[in-house]
């Protein structure tokens, strides 16, 4: 979640989201190894996404403690996986994510896992894949996750990356909830296929640790999202 283009980061200064009566959230990783979850909850945060895995060789050393801490504080929480389509298949990475904290259960406090797919921080921006191959990779990850859990994963991305690296595919808009990253006062144009975003990452800093997010709905809607109803 730290690899947004510099141009996007430059727009962050003084940017605030549209005023909404909506649940606030955060997302964290090993960059935030120690989080005071009680304070986060008292600050009005309702949900959190926590980095679990990356590729097929990395497990966040902070994930377990962060997940337990968020649970104990009464937050709705879920895990996310940073994709590396250049290293292995989508199915292989979905299985790795599922095996290391990325699962879902209908307990009312677990969000479906999220696939974080964005510009490559260490190589070709589209990981060396054509748009068609990228769409196939994402579908492989998504279908594998859905088969295992009964839920399609949330897709975290930017409109710019999605347009560049998938050819602005509309293939996932009716199945996968969208978590859009745009550091501005409004979400702007969404990737093709999605009529609305489910989550919006609107800043990479704020009162709480990690990135700042909004759920597009009310508290009851967030609970339904966790339940899968």
Where do the model's predicted regions map?
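Conserved beta-strand positions
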Residues: 28, 50, 115-117, 155-158, ...
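Fungal secretory targeting signals
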Residues: 1-17
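Hydrophobic anchor at the start of a short beta-strand
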Residues: 77, 151-153, 178
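Aromatic-lined carbohydrate-recognition surfaces of secreted/lumenal glycan-active proteins
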Residues: 145, 149-164
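Glycine-rich, charge-decorated loop segments at or immediately adjacent to ligand/cofactor-binding or catalytic sites
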Residues: 89-92, 163-171
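Functionally critical loop-and-helix segments that line ligand-binding/catalytic clefts
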Residues: 18-32, 38, 171-229
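Structural recognition of alpha->loop->beta junctions
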Residues: 98-114, 119-121, 167-196
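Substrate-binding cleft of extracellular glycoside hydrolase catalytic domains
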Residues: 18-148
């Amino acid at each position: 979640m730290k690899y947004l283009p510099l141009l996007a980061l430059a727009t962050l200064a003084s940017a605030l989201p549209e005023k909404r009566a909506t649940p606030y959230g955060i997302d964290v990783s090993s960059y935030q190894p120690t989080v005071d979850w009680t304070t986060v909850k008292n600050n009005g945060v309702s949900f959190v996404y926590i980095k679990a895995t990356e590729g097929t060789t990395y497990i966040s050393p902070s994930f377990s403690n962060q997940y337990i801490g968020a649970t104990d504080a009464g937050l709705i929480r879920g895990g996310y996986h940073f994709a590396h389509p250049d290293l292995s298949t989508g199915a292989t990475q979905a299985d790795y994510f599922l095996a290391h904290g990325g699962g879902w259960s209908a307990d009312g406090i677990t969000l479906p896992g999220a696939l974080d797919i964005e510009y490559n921080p260490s190589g070709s921006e589209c990981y060396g894949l054509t748009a068609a191959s990228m769409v196939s990779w994402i579908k492989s990850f998504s279908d594998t996750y859905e088969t295992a859990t009964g839920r399609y994963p949330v897709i975290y991305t930017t409109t710019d990356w999605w347009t560049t690296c998938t050819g602005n595919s509309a293939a996932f808009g009716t199945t996968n909830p969208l978590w859009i990253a745009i550091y501005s006062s409004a979400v702007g144009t969404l990737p093709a296929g999605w009529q609305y975003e489910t989550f919006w990452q609107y800043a990479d800093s704020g009162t709480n640790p990690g990135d700042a997010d909004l759920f597009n709905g009310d508290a009851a809607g967030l609970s339904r999202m966790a339940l899968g109803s």
